[in-house]
Every structure is written in structure tokens, then in C-alpha cells.
């Protein structure tokens, strides 16, 4: 062989042997050995296949009774006789002449098999329901319910058989003959067409009416179904038993009797029971009180009730005394406060803001404003010595008695009600125009205290009494401590670089006034405080109108400075001076200390740093949060 001018020769064959097909003896022997091995392998595989074919033919002969001609036989072997086995219980259907039976898709065959299986299961369920209905020693109610279950099972079986016949007719399969109708528990039969099913159910209903009339307890249970209208072929207008209506039976026929919707009492009974329970719970324990109730409590609803607010004198937070803890937690008075000693304040109008709060969270937000604004934590309840020690109701955990409020600095009319009774987001207002919340928070109060309260024209100093000619005005929480505490100002550590390292004089008593009027001691007279360290003497002076306007100006100025500090846009201290009409402030009694917080907030080091809020160096306020935070 020549490839591109080169002659290629085999190293094992010479040229004459390759041309004439003659090979060396060694090569011939190797080829023969390989062919023999291959022949042996094929014979072994053939013998295995023949054995398998022989077994299959014998199995076919056992089924058909004759040996197929494809059965392998040894040379000289005669076909053996095979005895046919007896046929099994399952009968094979004869081949249908319609070829559509053989052309069914797998999905149709699976659907047909599933429907046939469901029909067979429903037949067993109907038979079991009939046996249960015929069981002896059954009460009237049990027998009635079992008959109802049997009727449902028969109805479902009838529907499944109708579906099966429709499917077989659509697929071109022979329609199965009608099955033997199952007898009802009393001997009457129900055909597949369901002709006498309605009549039989009507007869059962009549029997139930007679049986219910004999039993007083069962006759009461059927009184709530007098309003039902007759459905279908029922002859009676009232059905004393639970769900027996025609449309209800069709609704529960979608599954087996075990999955039926359970019977529930009618809504009228539920609402009547609920109304009676609420009336029994809402009855006042004291015969001298009549608590107003909202309209929603008479309707049996479970929505949060809106309190019925009345116009008149402002209500006060009070709680009944002398009640046992169990009665206290279970009565409507558990949503009020302890009553005061004044009998004039013990009226129904004092409870209007606390009635009917069992389904809402209004009582949880009652004392937030009275405790110091929206951001302050609620104060714990301090029960009186004569009242119950522990209140079980969770709705009054944050309530406490409040003093009689004085005139507010925002109005010039009658005294405002406590903030617990004022309209809020939780309780819609129905009395008068809503009052706006205070403009500033606690930090503005501290800021105004830090800047010092202005004097009036007379130049009243620290701890001095104002002249009697001044017009007395109401006190607000921004009237502060400087006008109430006589004596020298509190002493602080001189070298305190942090507000947390300050000390306070142990002999100095300081507290914060309530947000809505005089302190409890000024309104109710001096009384022993549980903590003597928090006691504060009654005020010795009343600020004038000019001072109160100065407080507002200081608060607005503090709000402006706080905004400038936190916005990071200020280049230096930009404080607006106090209005000249206010008067000069008190001599500074606090260390004016600036806190360096870094050039990231106040700019380059060359600029004058903007002082931090000096509200941290205000007098210690321990009346609300406790002295541990200061």
C-alpha cells in the first residue's frame, strides 16, 4: 500500500502471504482459539434464553390448557401435557365489539377506575350506616341522627352511581345494570332515581316531631328552627331537629358522613346566651351606682365598645373602696379608679371614661399623659390602705388617683378634666373641642430650668416670695422648681465632666410638678408620702402671667437650639436672646459646660463648638422616673 509515495508493509506478514491470503501457522491457531471461545459464549446465552422461553410457555399452558407451538423442545422430546388451573374469582369481561374501549387514554382509564372504586366504598358506607340505624337500645335522638346519616350515605351513593353511568355512556362502554336498592332502616326502600326519598324524609320528620313532643328537653332544642321555610318535598313547615333541610343535605353530600359539617346552635341562642352573660357580669356590685353602658353591649358584638361620654363636670380617676379582690376584678367597677372621700364626686358621670373597656386597650393608655407625657413610662399603681391590695384586672395596672386639677395655663375657663378622661386616639371624643397636647417634652422643661426662670418687674430672687399685688395665675409643669423651692439652689460637683458623675445634695428635695395642675400636696393637703426623699413642701409663690409667657419663650428657644444642634448645619453657637419683656433671668447657678463631641457634628476645630444640651445639668428630677437615672 502506498500513501504519498511511501510503501507501508506489515511487520508480521510478508508480501506474498498478504496477497494470497496465506497466513503463518501461529496466526491461524490464534484465530481459531478466539472463534471457539465466542461460540461457547453464544451457546450459553442461547440455552438461558431457551429455558426462560420454556417457563413462559408452561405458564401460558396452565392458563389456556394447551402448550403453545413456540415452546422449545429437545431433539426427540415429545410435548408434555399441562393441566389447566381452575379459574380465579375474578371474571374477565368479554371483548367488547366497540373499538372505543381499547382506544381509551390512560387518564380516562384512571378516572373511570377511581370512580368505580369510590362507588364501591360508598356502598359499604351505606350498608354500615343502615346497620347502625337498626341497632337496638338507642335513644330517640341517637336513632334520629343515625337515620340522618343513613339518608346522607344513600344520597351520596345515588349521585356516584349516576356519575359512573354517565361516564361509561360517554366513553362508549356498556352501562352497568341498576343495583339492588338498599332498604331504609324501617323497611321502606330508596330507589336510584330518588323518587320516594323526599317522602320518606318527610315521614321521618313527622315521627321526630311526635317523639320530640314526648320529651320536654328535646322539644326545647327544636324551638329555634321555627323560622325555617320548607324546602323540596318536605311537608312540614318547622323542623325541630338540627340540620335536616334539603339544601343542607345537598351541601354535606360532597363527602362521607364523617366529614359532614357539625351541627351548631342557631345564632339567636348564641346571642341570647352572650347577652345574658354580659348582663350578669356588667351588673354593678354597689346598689347606689348605675354605670352607663355603650350601645354595642346590647347587641352581642365582640368589637371594642365606645364609652358613652356625658357632658358635665369633669370626671376624676377613682376606684371603689371596700370591695373584695374577687368582686373588684369581676365587676364593671374594675375599670374605674378608687373613689375619693368626697361624696359629691361619687357619681355616675365620674365613671363614663372607664366604662365598657373589656374588649379594647383604652385603659392601658389612660395614665400616660398624667404620668408625664407620651414618652414617659407609666407609673405603678399605689393602692390605698383601705382598698384592695392587689388588682386582678390588667386594664387598671397603670391607673392611679389624680388630684383635682387647677386652671390650665392654656385655657381661662373651668378646670380641665384629668388627661385620662380627655379625648385621645384610643377613645373618640364626644365632648367639646379637642385640646392640643403640650408643644414640648421633658427635655424642654429641663432646658427652661437650666436657663433659669425670669423674674417679674419686682425682681424676685431665688426662694423669695412675690408681692401680694401680683395676679395669681395657674401653674403648669413648666413653672418648674425654681419658683417653688425656697432656700439656696442645689449644689453639684464642680469637676463633673459627665452628667452621670454629678452628685446632688442629700438635703435637697426636688420633684417635678404634675402636667395638669398643682402637686398632690397643694390640691389635697399635706399627707405622708411613701418615700420621704421624694416629699416636696407646698409652693410658696404663684408665678405671674409674664413669667409663664417667659417659660413658653424659653421652651421655644430650646426647641430651636435642639433642632440646630441635631441637624448639624450650625457653624457656631446661635442662641436667640431672651425677649426683653420677660425680664433678666436668675443668676446662673449651674456650671456652663460645653461638651466636645467631635468635629464630625459641629464642624472644623477652628469653629466655636456648639454647646451641648445643658438639660443634663438641670436639678435632679426624681418624681417620675426615679433618682437612679440621675
From Swiss-Prot:
Gene Ontology terms: biological process: microtubule anchoring at centrosome; protein localization
Record PTM Omega-N-methylarginine, positions in chain: 435
Protein name: Coiled-coil domain-containing protein 120
Disordered: annotated segments: 212-435, 457-534
Coiled-coil portions: 109-173
InterPro entries in UniProt: CCDC120/INAVA (IPR043447), CUPID (IPR021774)
Quaternary structure annotation from Swiss-Prot or TrEMBL: Interacts with NIN and CEP170; leading to recruit them to centrosomes. Directly interacts with CYTH2; this interaction stabilizes CCDC120, possibly by preventing ubiquitination.
Region (Involved in CYTH2-binding): 31-70
Pfam families for the chain: CUPID
Compartmental location: Cytoplasm, Cytoskeleton, Microtubule organizing center, Centrosome, Centriole; Cytoplasm; Cell projection, Neuron projection; Cell projection, Growth cone
Amino acid at each position: 500500500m502506498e500513501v504519498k509515495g511511501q510503501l507501508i508493509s506489515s511487520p508480521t506478514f510478508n508480501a506474498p502471504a498478504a496477497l494470497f491470503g496465506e497466513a503463518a501457522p501461529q496466526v491461524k491457531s490464534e484465530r481459531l482459539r478466539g472463534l471457539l471461545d465466542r461460540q461457547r459464549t453464544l451457546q450459553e446465552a442461547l440455552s438461558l434464553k431457551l429455558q426462560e422461553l420454556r417457563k413462559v410457555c408452561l405458564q401460558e399452558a396452565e392458563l389456556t390448557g394447551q402448550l403453545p407451538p413456540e415452546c422449545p423442545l429437545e431433539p426427540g422430546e415429545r410435548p408434555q401435557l399441562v393441566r389447566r388451573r381452575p379459574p380465579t374469582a375474578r371474571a374477565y369481561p368479554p371483548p367488547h365489539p366497540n373499538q372505543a374501549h381499547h382506544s381509551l387514554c390512560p387518564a380516562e382509564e384512571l378516572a373511570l377506575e377511581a370512580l368505580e372504586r369510590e362507588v364501591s366504598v360508598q356502598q359499604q358506607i351505606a350498608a354500615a350506616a343502615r346497620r347502625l340505624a337498626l341497632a337496638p337500645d338507642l335513644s330517640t335522638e341517637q336513632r334520629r341522627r343515625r337515620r340522618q346519616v343513613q339518608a346522607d350515605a344513600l344520597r351520596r351513593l345515588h349521585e356516584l352511581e349516576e356519575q359512573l353511568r354517565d361516564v361509561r355512556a360517554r366513553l362508549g362502554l356498556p352501562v352497568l345494570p341498576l343495583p339492588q336498592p338498599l332498604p331504609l332502616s324501617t323497611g321502606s326502600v330508596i330507589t336510584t332515581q330518588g323518587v320516594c326519598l323526599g317522602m320518606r324524609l318527610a315521614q321521618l320528620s313527622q315521627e321526630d316531631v311526635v317523639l320530640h313532643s314526648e320529651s320536654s328537653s328535646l322539644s326545647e332544642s327544636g324551638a329555634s328552627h321555627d323560622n325555617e321555610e320548607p324546602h323540596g318535598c318536605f311537608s312540614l313547615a318547622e323542623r325541630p331537629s338540627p340540620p335536616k333541610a334539603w339544601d343542607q343535605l345537598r351541601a354535606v353530600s360532597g363527602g362521607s358522613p364523617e366529614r359532614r359539617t357539625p351541627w351548631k346552635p342557631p345564632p339567636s341562642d348564641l346571642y341570647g346566651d352572650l347577652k345574658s352573660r354580659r348582663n350578669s357580669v356588667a351588673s354593678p356590685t354597689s346598689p347606689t351606682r348605675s354605670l352607663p353602658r355603650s350601645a354595642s353591649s346590647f347587641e352581642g358584638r365582640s368589637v371594642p365598645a365606645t364609652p358613652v361620654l356625658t357632658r358635665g363636670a369633669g370626671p376624676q380617676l377613682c376606684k371603689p373602696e371596700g370591695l373584695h379582690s374577687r368582686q373588684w376584678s369581676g365587676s364593671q367597677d374594675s375599670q374605674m379608679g378608687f373613689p375619693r372621700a368626697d361624696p359629691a364626686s361619687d357619681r355616675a358621670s365620674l365613671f363614663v371614661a372607664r366604662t365598657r373597656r373589656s374588649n379594647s386597650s383604652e385603659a392601658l393608655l389612660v395614665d400616660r399623659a398624667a404620668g408625664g407625657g407620651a414618652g414617659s413610662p407609666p407609673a405603678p399603681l399605689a393602692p390605698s390602705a383601705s382598698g384592695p391590695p392587689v388588682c386582678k384586672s390588667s386594664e387598671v395596672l397603670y391607673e392611679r388617683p389624680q388630684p383635682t386639677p387647677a386652671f390650665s395655663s392654656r385655657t381661662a375657663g373651668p378646670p380641665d378634666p384629668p388627661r385620662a378622661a380627655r379625648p385621645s386616639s384610643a377613645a373618640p371624643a364626644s365632648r367639646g373641642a379637642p385640646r392640643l397636647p403640650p408643644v414640648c417634652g421633658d427635655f424642654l422643661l429641663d432646658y427652661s430650668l437650666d436657663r433659669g426662670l425670669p423674674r417679674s418687674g419686682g425682681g424676685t430672687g431665688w426662694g423669695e416670695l412675690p408681692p401680694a399685688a401680683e395676679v395669681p395665675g395657674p401653674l403648669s409643669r413648666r413653672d418648674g422648681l425654681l419658683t417653688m423651692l425656697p432656700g439656696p439652689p442645689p449644689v453639684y460637683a464642680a469637676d463633673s465632666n459627665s452628667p452621670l458623675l454629678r452628685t446632688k445634695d442629700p438635703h435637697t428635695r426636688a420633684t417635678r410638678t404634675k402636667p395638669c395642675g398643682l402637686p398632690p400636696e397643694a390640691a389635697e393637703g399635706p399627707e405622708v408620702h411613701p418615700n420621704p426623699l421624694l416629699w416636696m413642701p407646698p409652693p410658696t409663690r404663684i408665678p405671674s402671667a409674664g413669667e409663664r409667657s417667659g417659660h413658653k419663650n424659653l421652651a421655644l428657644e430650646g426647641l430651636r437650639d435642639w433642632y440646630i444642634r441635631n441637624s448639624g448645619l450650625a457653624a457656631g453657637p446661635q442662641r436667640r436672646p431672651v425677649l426683653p419683656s420677660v425680664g433678666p433671668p436668675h443668676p446662673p447657678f449651674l456650671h456652663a459646660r460645653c461638651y466636645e463631641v467631635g468635629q464630625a457634628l459641629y464642624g472644623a476645630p477652628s469653629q466655636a463648638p456648639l454647646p451641648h444640651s445643658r438639660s443634663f445639668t438641670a436639678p435632679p428630677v426624681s418624681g417620675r422616673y426615679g433618682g437612679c437615672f440621675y
